[in-house]
């Protein structure tokens, strides 16, 4: 590029009539004359450079030519990058066709991938590695299929340490992870918790395939609706798919209580909507709320429903905010409105408030949901591990320093309310006669075992924990949410299996 530029400048210089002889300068003035006289240039009798009336025009012409060449090269470089990114997409699509045409007798575990030349992309993080089975290496279902085991209960099984196929992604490389669940980023050196795979008894979970899932979501919207544990699952899902989407073709957008992840390549959206009590409440602000002082509006859900009712897939959850934080804690329920002058405030048991919320949600779904379009899921209770004495530990440490799952089969914590899920199944069952099925994601039992998988003190909640807070795990260790990669990835494997195969 540079040799062509200099040749062009030389040609312009020649056309201007300026000759290329050497310039001869007089000796500089003596020391005593410094500052009194300017050095003057003299030339041979053939030299006319400094006196040429075309000198200014020559310089301007040269500068214009320089900028034209640089702009042209930059434009060609940008187009070349776009073309290579588009080529990556086309190669991936072609590879998917080839994989679909692969004979059924192909060997189990055979992998084919298309790796894009990374040197042509805008940044190292924009590397595109379209590998259709990258995350599926060590599971038992050879082609990511369902195995035909439609009666299999995935929720019954055991955790198997798997250093080959787990984790499904790197938390340090997921650009959309939240700091409150990024445990290895905030100092957790033990990463064993990332390598456990859930193995159901007598069957296998379909392998998660990010590109197939994104294809399923093409021109569709998946929305998670609920509390911070549901946001935990949403972040997990985004991390499970975002690695397979090049930079510039994905985006996270904040809009009040709604956070959207957009995959432009597929025109797919994966949303999280903050609605911890499902109904309208005084806790609807995702930042400003008080867990201990809660009021729900028993007859108001439309403000929330207008956000999620047209989605293709909806995953609700609501459990954490219905647990008692202390003895005697009640839920305040408001009927009517102050505007209409008929406001009435009651206090009910927490579980009764939960029933009020689910019945109102069910009533709305039955009257407004498009059963031919929208599939509905409800995530089971996510157990906390705040009382180490439940498994023989020290309550002062909560779940800090736990590195192994609980090995007691069918272990159930005394603090997990299984009756709430039974109530949810009963209430959602009233939609069946209307042709609306709410699929329960039975995640509770498998999560009960994982006392080792919480952020504890290895997190950031708006600001990093202080040394004093880190030294006081009985107050500041988070044993409710889940490190990522981790347990919520399995919840999403359940969701994937239902969406793709059932």
Curated annotation (Swiss-Prot):
Cysteine pairings via disulfide bonds: 152-203, 174-239, 183-483, 399-479
Bilayer topology annotation: Single-pass type II membrane protein
Transmembrane annotation, as ranges: 54-76
GO MF, one example: xylan O-acetyltransferase activity
Domain of life assignment: Eukaryota
Glycan-linked positions: 153, 163, 189, 209, 255, 267, 372, 401, 442
Chain location of the short sequence motif DXXH motif per the record: 478-481
InterPro entries reported for this sequence: TBL (IPR029962), TBL_C (IPR026057), TBL_N (IPR025846)
Cytoplasmic domain ranges by topology: 1-53
Active-site residues from the entry: 228, 478, 481
Span(s) of short sequence motif GDS motif: 226-228
Short name of any one Pfam family annotated for the protein: PMR5N
Gene Ontology biological process terms, A to Z: defense response; xylan acetylation
GO cellular component, one term: Golgi membrane
Family stated for the protein in its record: Belongs to the PC-esterase family. TBL subfamily.
Protein name (record): Xylan O-acetyltransferase 13
């Amino acid at each position: 590029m540079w040799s062509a530029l200099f040749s062009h400048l030389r040609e312009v210089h020649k056309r201007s009539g300026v000759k290329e002889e050497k310039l001869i300068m007089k000796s500089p003035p003596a020391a005593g004359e410094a500052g009194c006289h300017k050095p003057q240039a003299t030339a041979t009798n053939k030299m006319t450079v400094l006196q040429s009336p075309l000198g200014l025009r020559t310089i301007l012409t040269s500068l214009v030519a320089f900028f034209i060449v640089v702009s042209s090269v930059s434009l060609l470089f940008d187009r070349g990058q776009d073309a290579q990114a588009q080529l990556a997409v086309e190669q991936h699509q072609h590879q998917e066709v080839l994989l679909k045409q692969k004979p059924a007798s192909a060997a189990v575990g055979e992998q084919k991938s298309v790796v894009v030349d990374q040197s042509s992309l805008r940044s190292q993080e924009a590397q595109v590695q379209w590998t259709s089975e990258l995350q599926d290496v060590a599971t038992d279902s050879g082609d990511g299929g369902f195995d035909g085991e439609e009666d299999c209960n995935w929720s019954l099984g055991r955790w198997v340490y798997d250093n080959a196929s787990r984790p499904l992604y790197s938390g340090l490389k997921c650009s959309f992870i939240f700091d409150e669940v990024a445990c290895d980023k905030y100092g957790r050196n033990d990463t064993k918790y990332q390598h456990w795979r859930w193995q159901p008894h007598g069957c296998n979970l379909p392998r998660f395939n990010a590109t197939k899932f994104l294809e399923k979501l093409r021109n569709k919207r998946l929305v998670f609706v609920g509390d911070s544990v549901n946001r935990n699952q949403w972040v997990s899902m985004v991390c499970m798919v975002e690695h397979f989407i090049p930079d510039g073709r994905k985006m996270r957008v904040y809009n009040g209580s709604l956070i959207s992840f957009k995959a432009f390549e597929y025109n797919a959206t994966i949303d999280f909507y903050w609605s911890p009590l499902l109904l309208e409440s005084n806790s609807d602000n995702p930042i400003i709320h008080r867990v201990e002082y809660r009021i729900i509006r028993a007859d108001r859900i439309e403000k929330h429903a207008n956000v999620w009712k047209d989605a293709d897939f909806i995953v609700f959850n609501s459990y954490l905010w219905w647990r008692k934080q202390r003895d005697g804690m009640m839920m305040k329920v408001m009927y009517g409105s102050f505007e209409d002058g008929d406001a009435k405030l009651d206090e009910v048991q927490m579980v009764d408030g939960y029933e009020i919320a689910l019945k109102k949600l069910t009533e709305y779904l039955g009257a407004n949901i498009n059963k031919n379009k929208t599939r509905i899921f409800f995530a089971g209770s996510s157990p906390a591990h705040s009382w180490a004495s439940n498994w023989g530990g020290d309550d002062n440490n909560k779940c800090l320093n736990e590195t192994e799952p609980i090995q007691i089969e069918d272990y159930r914590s005394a603090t997990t309310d299984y009756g709430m899920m039974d109530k949810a199944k009963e209430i959602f069952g009233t939609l069946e006669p209307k042709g609306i099925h709410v699929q329960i994601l039975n995640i509770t039992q498998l999560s009960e075992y994982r006392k080792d998988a919480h952020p504890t003190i290895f997190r950031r909640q708006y600001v990093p924990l202080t040394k004093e807070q880190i030294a006081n795990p009985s107050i500041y260790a988070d044993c409710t949410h889940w490190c990522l990669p981790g347990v919520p990835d399995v919840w999403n494997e359940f969701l994937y299996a239902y969406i793709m195969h059932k």
